């Protein structure tokens, strides 16, 4: 385990009891213990090869990483190191070092476990910047990610208060879809592909494919445009067109583990654009629709982490040079073997058609049914795995689905911006298949 160097170089601690005294010496190589919060690395006089941390008052744990004085959490609780260890229903948390938890993304054996507060205990933590501290809880044969019974230090929130219209953890009696609305303000600045929370992109849909052996793999992103409909890219499904093969998650921000409040859907209809085509690089008419239902026949239910995105007005796209958000589980480099575990977001700027059709860009490959967008510094971009996901821009004062991640050469390559399906050119197609049902909003 990677350790933090937080010990002094030399000191002597003498501990006495009624039977005599035992000398404990701080080692000159004290950093080997990885003591935190003022803890001192000591060894027994006659067993110098046995080292441990001697913790100051209020701190416990192998590395003095547990703060017994913390009875509430600040912010989203990422720095919480207290001893709460039950979910909001009182179920005990599983130890982070238990054999079953080790199969999950966050556990005590990660190289960065100490920095994340994970260790040989079952205390609530928030290693992935979710809404509040959480833990794994055993429910039947399943391990579930559950929010914890620990209050916010602000004092305005227990684990489930009455709804006041402002508290992000409260539960209103009735929530309605309001397209383009999210709990967090738009972040129209370059963020370098940083991890984000699903509340920042609550319309994002994660699409997976089932395999014959029972395994499930991530395929593409999508966007919720009405309670029952997700829009994505046809090229994601062109090789496997059986709707029964696909699963859609809303409200999910981690690739292989559940997120509190997420919803799982089967695909009732899979509609690929009839004029889709692809050449050596470009994808044409690259748009698809998925009608979704839960196993109980329900469409999506609105929440802080599940919301629809507005469709753009006809011929009313954001102006070239505008900043837009992209989000997904895409690889940082096309040569990467694995997709990142955490949902990521970055910001790009729309590139004019005239510029994108220059020979050193893409030339005639780019049509008027496409949009180009890029980071001006060519440092961030959509990449493999982001396909089908949203390009969200502010249009006429509201957030709209301006584009769908479609194609491009490499990722963040100079003079090779990402190319997106131009949604405003497919509004008639969308309405033809969706009809007047299900609350499509512009």
Curated annotation (Swiss-Prot):
<dbReference type="GO" id="GO:0033628">
    <property type="term" value="P:regulation of cell adhesion mediated by integrin"/>
</dbReference>
<keyword id="KW-0720">Serine protease</keyword>
<dbReference type="InterPro" id="IPR009003">
    <property type="entry name" value="Peptidase_S1_PA"/>
</dbReference>
<feature type="domain" description="Kringle">
    <location>
        <begin position="72"/>
        <end position="153"/>
    </location>
</feature>
<keyword id="KW-0378">Hydrolase</keyword>
<dbReference type="InterPro" id="IPR038178">
    <property type="entry name" value="Kringle_sf"/>
</dbReference>
<feature type="disulfide bond">
    <location>
        <begin position="33"/>
        <end position="41"/>
    </location>
</feature>
<keyword id="KW-0865">Zymogen</keyword>
<dbReference type="InterPro" id="IPR050127">
    <property type="entry name" value="Serine_Proteases_S1"/>
</dbReference>
<keyword id="KW-0732">Signal</keyword>
<keyword id="KW-0645">Protease</keyword>
<dbReference type="GO" id="GO:0042730">
    <property type="term" value="P:fibrinolysis"/>
</dbReference>
<feature type="disulfide bond">
    <location>
        <begin position="356"/>
        <end position="372"/>
    </location>
</feature>
<comment type="function">
    <text>Specifically cleaves the zymogen plasminogen to form the active enzyme plasmin.</text>
</comment>
<protein>
    <recommendedName>
        <fullName>Urokinase-type plasminogen activator</fullName>
        <ecNumber>3.4.21.73</ecNumber>
    </recommendedName>
</protein>
<feature type="disulfide bond">
    <location>
        <begin position="324"/>
        <end position="393"/>
    </location>
</feature>
<feature type="disulfide bond">
    <location>
        <begin position="72"/>
        <end position="153"/>
    </location>
</feature>
<dbReference type="InterPro" id="IPR000001">
    <property type="entry name" value="Kringle"/>
</dbReference>
<feature type="disulfide bond">
    <location>
        <begin position="383"/>
        <end position="411"/>
    </location>
</feature>
<keyword id="KW-0617">Plasminogen activation</keyword>
<feature type="disulfide bond">
    <location>
        <begin position="220"/>
        <end position="236"/>
    </location>
</feature>
<feature type="disulfide bond" description="Interchain (between A and B chains)">
    <location>
        <begin position="179"/>
        <end position="310"/>
    </location>
</feature>
<dbReference type="InterPro" id="IPR033116">
    <property type="entry name" value="TRYPSIN_SER"/>
</dbReference>
<dbReference type="InterPro" id="IPR001314">
    <property type="entry name" value="Peptidase_S1A"/>
</dbReference>
<feature type="glycosylation site" description="N-linked (GlcNAc...) asparagine">
    <location>
        <position position="152"/>
    </location>
</feature>
<dbReference type="InterPro" id="IPR018114">
    <property type="entry name" value="TRYPSIN_HIS"/>
</dbReference>
<keyword id="KW-0964">Secreted</keyword>
<dbReference type="InterPro" id="IPR001254">
    <property type="entry name" value="Trypsin_dom"/>
</dbReference>
<feature type="disulfide bond">
    <location>
        <begin position="35"/>
        <end position="53"/>
    </location>
</feature>
<dbReference type="InterPro" id="IPR013806">
    <property type="entry name" value="Kringle-like"/>
</dbReference>
<feature type="domain" description="EGF-like">
    <location>
        <begin position="29"/>
        <end position="65"/>
    </location>
</feature>
<dbReference type="Pfam" id="PF00089">
    <property type="entry name" value="Trypsin"/>
</dbReference>
<feature type="disulfide bond">
    <location>
        <begin position="228"/>
        <end position="299"/>
    </location>
</feature>
<keyword id="KW-0325">Glycoprotein</keyword>
<feature type="signal peptide">
    <location>
        <begin position="1"/>
        <end position="20"/>
    </location>
</feature>
<keyword id="KW-0420">Kringle</keyword>
<feature type="domain" description="Peptidase S1">
    <location>
        <begin position="190"/>
        <end position="435"/>
    </location>
</feature>
<feature type="region of interest" description="Connecting peptide">
    <location>
        <begin position="154"/>
        <end position="189"/>
    </location>
</feature>
<dbReference type="GO" id="GO:0006508">
    <property type="term" value="P:proteolysis"/>
</dbReference>
<dbReference type="InterPro" id="IPR043504">
    <property type="entry name" value="Peptidase_S1_PA_chymotrypsin"/>
</dbReference>
<dbReference type="GO" id="GO:0005615">
    <property type="term" value="C:extracellular space"/>
</dbReference>
<dbReference type="InterPro" id="IPR000742">
    <property type="entry name" value="EGF-like_dom"/>
</dbReference>
């Amino acid at each position: 385990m990677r350790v933090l160097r937080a010990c002094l170089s030399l000191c002597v601690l003498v501990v006495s009891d009624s039977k005599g005294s035992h000398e404990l010496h701080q080692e000159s190589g004290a950093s080997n213990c990885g003591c935190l919060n003022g803890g001192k690395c000591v060894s027994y006089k006659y067993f110098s090869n046995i080292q441990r941390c001697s913790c100051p008052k209020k701190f416990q744990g192998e590395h003095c990483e547990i703060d017994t004085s913390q009875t509430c959490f600040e912010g989203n609780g990422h720095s919480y190191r207290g001893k709460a260890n039950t979910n909001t229903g009182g179920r005990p948390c599983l130890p982070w070092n238990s054999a079953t938890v080790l199969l999950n993304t966050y556990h005590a054996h990660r190289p960065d476990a100490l920095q994340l507060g994970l260790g040989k205990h079952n205390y609530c933590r928030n290693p992935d910047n979710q809404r509040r501290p959480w833990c794994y809880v055993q429910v039947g044969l399943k391990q579930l990610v559950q929010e914890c019974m620990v209050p916010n230090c602000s004092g305005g929130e227990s684990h489930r208060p009455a709804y006041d219209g402002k508290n992000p953890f409260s539960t209103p009696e009735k929530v309605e879809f309001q397209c383009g609305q999210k709990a967090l303000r738009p972040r129209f600045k370059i963020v370098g592909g940083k991890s984000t929370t699903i509340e920042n992109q609550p319309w994002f849909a994660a699409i997976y494919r089932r395999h014959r052996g029972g395994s499930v793999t991530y395929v593409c992103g999508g966007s919720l445009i009405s309670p029952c409909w997700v829009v994505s890219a046809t090229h994601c499904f062109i090789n496997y067109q059986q709707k029964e093969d696909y699963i859609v998650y809303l409200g999910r921000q981690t690739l292989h583990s559940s997120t509190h409040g997420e919803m799982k859907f089967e695909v009732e209809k899979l509609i690929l654009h009839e004029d889709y085509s692809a050449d050596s690089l470009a994808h044409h008419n690259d748009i698809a629709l998925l009608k979704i239902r839960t196993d109980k026949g329900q469409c999506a239910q609105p929440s802080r982490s599940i919301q629809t995105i507005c469709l753009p007005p006809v011929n009313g796209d954001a102006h070239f040079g505008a900043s837009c958000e992209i989000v997904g589980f895409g690889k940082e480099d096309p040569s990467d073997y694995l997709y990142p575990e955490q949902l990521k977001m970055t910001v790009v700027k729309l590139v004019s058609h005239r510029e994108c059709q220059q020979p050193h860009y893409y030339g005639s490959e780019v049509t008027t049914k496409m949009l180009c967008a890029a980071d001006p510094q060519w440092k961030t971009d959509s990449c493999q795995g982001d396909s089908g996901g949203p390009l969200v821009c502010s249009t006429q004062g509201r957030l709209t689905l301006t584009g769908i991640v479609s194609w491009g050469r490499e990722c963040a390559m100079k003079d090779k911006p990402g190319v997106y399906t131009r949604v405003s050119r497919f509004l008639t197609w969308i309405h033809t298949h969706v009809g007047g049902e299900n609350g499509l909003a512009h």
